[in-house]
A protein has these predicted regions:
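Short helix-loop "hinge" at the ATP-lid/N-box region of the Bergerat-fold HATPase_c
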Residues: 63-64
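Short conserved segment of the HATPase_c
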Residues: 95-108
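Short beta-strand/loop element within the Bergerat-fold HATPase_c
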Residues: 70-82
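Short conserved segments within the C-terminal catalytic ATPase subdomain
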Residues: 4, 29-39
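Conserved micro-motifs of the catalytic ATP-binding
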Residues: 2-8, 44-47
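Short alpha-helical Gxxx[C/S/T] motif in the catalytic ATP-binding
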Residues: 124, 128
């Protein structure tokens, strides 16, 4: 899983700036259904800016696609000793999948009957996890009530 991502050219990436760029990009789509996106916190990591943009774009796109109208997708960054943690939290429409780990499997789509008007091959989260792993990071998902939280942990250098 992720062998195709051989090397990562690492430069300093301002994640807050990158996530705010993505927020601006996705806002028109979110506005159509009364959804909002917030970004709080800061953090700089060593990584490939384009690859990280793709990973976070996948996460944000899914958050907007699979959340009910008039809800907020909250992105929170926090630094600890050697890492930046990014939490992307949104309300789920329908039932949260029983096994969240499966969301990262290639071609897996959680109960397609819930997502009758969505497109996708089920590769986005698998690719996202590969990108995060190529950066020496971790990606996980957990349920908190009606919300799902995707957590990304990336090294600062």
């Amino acid at each position: 899983s992720g062998q195709w991502l051989v090397g990562v050219d690492k430069f300093f990436v301002d994640l807050a700036a990158k996530l705010n760029e993505l927020r601006e990009l996705f806002e028109p789509l979110a506005d159509e259904t009364g959804k909002t996106i917030t970004v709080e916190g800061e953090g700089v990591v060593a990584g490939d800016s384009d690859m990280l943009r793709r990973a976070f774009s996948n996460l944000l796109s899914n958050a907007i696609k699979y959340s009910p109208d008039n809800t907020c997708t909250a992105i929170h960054l926090e630094r600890d000793s050697d890492c930046v943690n990014v939490m992307i939290t949104n309300t789920m429409s329908g039932q949260v999948p029983a096994n969240l780990e499966r969301l990262f499997d290639r071609f897996y789509r959680a109960d397609s009957s819930r997502f009758y008007n969505t497109e996708g091959a089920g590769l986005g989260l698998s690719i996202t996890r590969s990108i995060i792993h190529a950066h020496g990071g971790e990606l996980s998902a957990e349920q908190q009530g009606r919300e799902i939280v995707f957590s990304v942990r990336l090294l600062m250098d």
